[in-house]
Amino acid sequence: MTAAAGSAGHAAVPLLLCALLVPGGAYVLDDSDGLGREFDGVGAVSGGGATSRLLVNYPEPYRSQILDYLFKPNFGASLHILKVEIGGDGQTTDGTEPSHMHYALDENFFRGYEWWLMKEAKKRNPNIILMGLPWSFPGWIGKGFNWPYVNLQLTAYYIMTWIVGAKHYHDLDIDYIGIWNERSFDINYIKVLRRMLNYQGLDRVKIIASDNLWEPISASMLLDSELLKVIDVIGAHYPGTHTVKDAKLTKKKLWSSEDFSTLNSDVGAGCLGRILNQNYVNGYMTATIAWNLVASYYEQLPYGRCGLMTAQEPWSGHYVVESPIWVSAHTTQFTQPGWYYLKTVGHLEKGGSYVALTDGLGNLTIIVETMSHKQSACIRPFLPYFNVSRQFATFVLKGSFSEIPELQVWYTKLGKPSERYLFKQLDSLWLLDSSSTFTLELQEDEIFTLTTLTVGSKGSYPLPPKSEPFPQIYEDDFDVDYPFFSEAPNFADQTGVFEYFTNIEDPGEHRFTLRQVLNQRPITWAADAYNTISIIGDYKWSNLTVRCDVYIETPEKGGVFIAGRVNKGGILIRSARGIFFWIFANGTYRVTGDLAGWVIYALGRVDVTAKKWYTLTLIIKGRLSSGMLNGKTVWKNIPVSFPKNGWAAIGTHSFEFAQFDNFHVEATR
């Protein structure tokens, strides 16, 4: 007797009541012996770094639609947790995010876009949990060392100001704060941070540590009772669904505080579907946080399209609601932080897993996944082979769930396009005459959610505009008097921080500019370049003309560049190749084939000094390139054979103040 049938290709998706005797595993879902661990939610990371960079430039209504798919309850991913980078001015994977304190006496709580993003998330879901975590720190924190623990009080003060600023300027309550992403922790610093938070009346802000591996933080907590007391959650990254004995012995909440990081294809969706269940089944992790929230960065940067959805074309408005959004919905739309897992969770006989959660008020949500090995391999760690095959799974509801009359059914099938379904609602399942028992026929690469809740929905908007390449002619004069965001559209800083700037002393043509504002190397998380650089455009550009007005602020030692065909960014920025046209305050110019300046095509003298505006022009066509200063040719037809294509860019010789204006690029692929 088939209770409900949705179609999957030409085959039915049967839900069978117990009246039909079928072989297979039997799984009891029961709360008679109490409940399991408290569920803390499903979330995603914005940052680590600059992963939401292009999102802010999207025109309406598309930007709001993207945000709805991510945060709006019972619409799309419906995330419970948003974790953001506390910008520290350093390169943190796909770019830099600005600090709220570039310098020791500087405070600005409107830089970057994480404040805005948190407010947009809260606007859609007032109950969303907010987390902050630093990847890099501004250089002054280290007092000459590439280390944030030189002065523990100073670093704790810096983090505390971010939390206080979030509340004072944006009315945002930060719920959790981390230590240092995937880097060393300092036991005394964690204690100092807790004391400082308490002193500031921030007792409610919980500490999560150490956003790296389970060890040595777990063992350290077992050996230090004060440390054990001040850490609320142990957060591990990419745990492969498993934890360690020491972590469990702490009796603290265990989270996969960064996971996924996989191309958002159906394989990435399968990865997410598997770990959302098995992080708890195997490792007792009660929250899973995906990196990253939305792939809103140039796709050729590291980890392209490793977000829950893709929004990397603000110039066209095009975005893609990828399958991980709907895999997330299977859990997020039918649970809430504060629900509890049942103790009766586990693996299916022929592969896959099941979890069940309750709000303690009679509601029940069951999530069953049968992700195959080939369909669910995450980017890391290595996934040992396992087999999943067709099976029947019989579930028996006992305890307070034995009287449930009806379950709503939601279904996903990943893989072949002809059989593919994403978050499809099937007919509900009636249990009144079934002795609270039902059987699922399961194929591989499926997800079922069965729930008493009727709130689920597959949200949708009209299709966004079609995909378009970056405009071949693009210009920006940076003439923005009161910018809503601190950074100019589409520029993606890869080392250094480039911000809108107002020249109070220059009422003329260059009153509003883009300025590189770091004068000191940050405490780095990745291999930042020794030069600052911001990229823009289409990675496929080959023939292009870049023109920009430039202003060197540092006498004698200062220098700036414009560039084309820049072929690397993110954590690989130090080794970027391209064609770079430099001028220096000492009256010299240089043409190099790399950002580091090792490959020199030409050099010589020019009439250049600091504190004066110049117009640089770089022309690249085929195998030849030329450069002009104030409209006069400085070098011409220099052979350049590599790379064949890449972004346009601007930047400085070192961590120094410099300004850019009237940027213009004209390109062909």
From Swiss-Prot:
Positions bound to substrate: 93, 135, 181, 380
Protein name in UniProt: Galactocerebrosidase
Intracellular or extracellular location(s): Lysosome
PANTHER family cross-referenced by the UniProt entry: GALACTOCEREBROSIDASE
Highest taxon, organism lineage: Eukaryota
Catalytic residues identified in the record: 182, 258
Function: Hydrolyzes the galactose ester bonds of glycolipids such as galactosylceramide and galactosylsphingosine. Enzyme with very low activity responsible for the lysosomal catabolism of galactosylceramide, a major lipid in myelin, kidney and epithelial cells of small intestine and colon.
GO biological process: galactosylceramide catabolic process
Organism the protein comes from: Canis lupus familiaris
